[in-house]
Amino acid sequence: MEQQPLTLTAATTRAQELRKQLNQYSHEYYVKDQPSVEDYVYDRLYKELVDIETEFPDLITPDSPTQRVGGKVLSGFEKAPHDIPMYSLNDGFSKEDIFAFDERVRKAIGKPVAYCCELKIDGLAISLRYENGVFVRGATRGDGTVGENITENLRTVRSVPMRLTEPISVEVRGECYMPKQSFVALNEEREENGQDIFANPRNAAAGSLRQLDTKIVAKRNLNTFLYTVADFGPMKAKTQFEALEELSAIGFRTNPERQLCQSIDEVWAYIEEYHEKRSTLPYEIDGIVIKVNEFALQDELGFTVKAPRWAIAYKFPPEEAETVVEDIEWTIGRTGVVTPTAVMAPVRVAGTTVSRASLHNADFIQMKDIRLNDHVIIYKAGDIIPEVAQVLVEKRAADSQPYEMPTHCPICHSELVHLDEEVALRCINPKCPAQIKEGLNHFVSRNAMNIDGLGPRVLAQMYDKGLVKDVADLYFLTEEQLMTLDKIKEKSANNIYTAIQGSKENSVERLIFGLGIRHVGAKAAKILAEHFGDLPTLSRATAEEIVALDSIGETIADSVVTYFENEEVHELMAELEKAQVNLTYKGLRTEQLAEVESPFKDKTVVLTGKLAQYTREEAKEKIENLGGKVTGSVSKKTDIVVAGEDAGSKLTKAESLGVTVWNEQEMVDALDASHF
């Protein structure tokens, strides 16, 4: 029976229902980290809302989840005055500073006080304004009196609620930051693309929020912690600790690592604890914020011209060390970017021994004037990546000479060039052995074709011996050829051959990612595969068709089209097809959702222990292709735990929660019985 078109009244009602439902699911996923539905359930409802808003554009509201994805290109940022100033905090750098702060507070109040201690997130200070519970404005701190209006960019940050659980009008303050893992991935991508890298996660967050293209912001995986209210009039809390609880209750993401301390000794113990834990956190912190807990006492203490008297920010000492640059090595990535690395005298920084640091590109070396045998200060950016922070010029030898940049590829000796005003040097020889080897490494990697046994050493041997010249050649190798490689005996050769042949059955998104198309990551590859269905169809797609997809911008679209315009790519596709490598998407496409029959459909599954018949990745992929979701931890939301050999604490927790437990064979039987 043909579905009747919606009336305006019906569309209005349904859009309201969908917005409420989707905002709740988003809050559970991004703020509480407790998703209650599978991704594709959310996606299906989201698509329904998009369709309604497309047909009835007047129904689009500021709190609609469709307004998060970005797509607007802004001409600039308007000024955003703060009715209530965003004060900075006085800093403390030692135990003496913190104890002196406590002494001043107790002297002014006349009694001991309790303190609320919170982690000082190293991001960008933001202010969020809500009217009747709906997000209407987001701004940067600026000078504390006037910031910049970044509302459209903050709409793309998933942990910023579009609508609160209470219809109150309130302005809250907090920090927008970039998680460490996202920071590393972003810099790797920028380095590979010849762009300037960010010095640290704070700069990355700030730079992202000041992007004029909101679609770029949406891809940056920013997050937030909210920690105070500009005016507590609409709030019930009487203390800072209660305020954080209340902020969480009405929909904001707050940091759970806070602690209420009854004395300054407890405060110092908290500081020492998180100074040790700092490197284990998934986000960057640069200190601890200490606030008098009771608002009545805060009011009594008041403010100076610049800062509150009732709070102080303890700043951690920098994790840095001095060493000597002994050499600068250059390596070539799969897209031809030539990256310099400083080889240094080993030194301890942030608990680890460091002897190498990325110098990113030639401009970085020239900007800092880094030379061989220079004494330098290094630190860990985001507690992760060793960076050269400073050159100690006063210790430089009198006969020191500026570092001479390479002009030719260290591997194939082709001339190095700058493309399109990139900061990176590139080798543009498509036959460069280093690029081909890196491309082979990428092709067999875990998120690509996932071929076990083919590490960089083995692949380099294959190339050097003339066994492979491109990725398609892998599929024509024989076991006898594999046994000609160093340290590859009959059993290893058989294992590698079996792994290569098995990868032919992968769903095509792995192949798309493995081909190394510039700017196309694993997520974009899956979006492309799901929409176009197979590689030949994708190869014929126009930039307009590609850019119309959610989360796919012009850069990716142009890159994909350019890639498939190359005749050598079509020859490679023909060879892959000849080798019977699967070129189609095996996952669940939107139009097939209703037809799926599987015990895994709509279920949350956890895999634990050793599996004999599949690798963990293979099992995960098969379950997700049938509409299930595989997560890494057991909770009340888990439907099935598959327990392999030597299953440990996850099995114990599943049993204690009464979650259904399957052995591996039950999982295999369920996979075999599934179809769509």
Curated annotation (Swiss-Prot):
| Record domain BRCT: where | 595-676
Q: Which GO terms describe its biological process?
A: DNA repair; DNA replication
- List the cofactors: Mg(2+); Mn(2+)
Q: Which domain of life is it from?
A: Bacteria
Tell me the SMART domains matching this sequence: BRCT, LIGANc
Q: Which residues form the active site?
A: 120 (n6-amp-lysine intermediate)
Coiled coil (UniProt feature): none
- Its EC top class is ligase
Which Enzyme Commission numbers does its entry carry? 6.5.1.2
GO CC term (a single one): cytosol
Task: Give the reaction(s) catalysed.
Answer: NAD(+) + (deoxyribonucleotide)n-3'-hydroxyl + 5'-phospho-(deoxyribonucleotide)m = (deoxyribonucleotide)n+m + AMP + beta-nicotinamide D-nucleotide
User: Which CDD domains does the entry link to?
Assistant: BRCT_DNA_ligase_like, LIGANc
Q: Where does NAD(+) bind?
A: 39-43, 88-91, 118, 141, 175, 291, 315
One Pfam family per UniProt: DNA_ligase_aden
Does DNA damage show up as a keyword for this record?
Answer: yes
Q: Which InterPro entries match?
A: BRCT_dom (IPR001357), BRCT_dom_sf (IPR036420), DisA/LigA_HHH (IPR041663), DNA_ligase (IPR001679), DNA_ligase_AS (IPR018239), DNA_ligase_CS (IPR033136), DNAligase_adenylation (IPR013839), DNAligase_N (IPR013840)
Q: Where does Zn(2+) bind?
A: 409, 412, 427, 432
Name the family.
Belongs to the NAD-dependent DNA ligase family. LigA subfamily.
**This chain belongs to which protein, by name?**
DNA ligase
Q: Which gene encodes it?
A: ligA
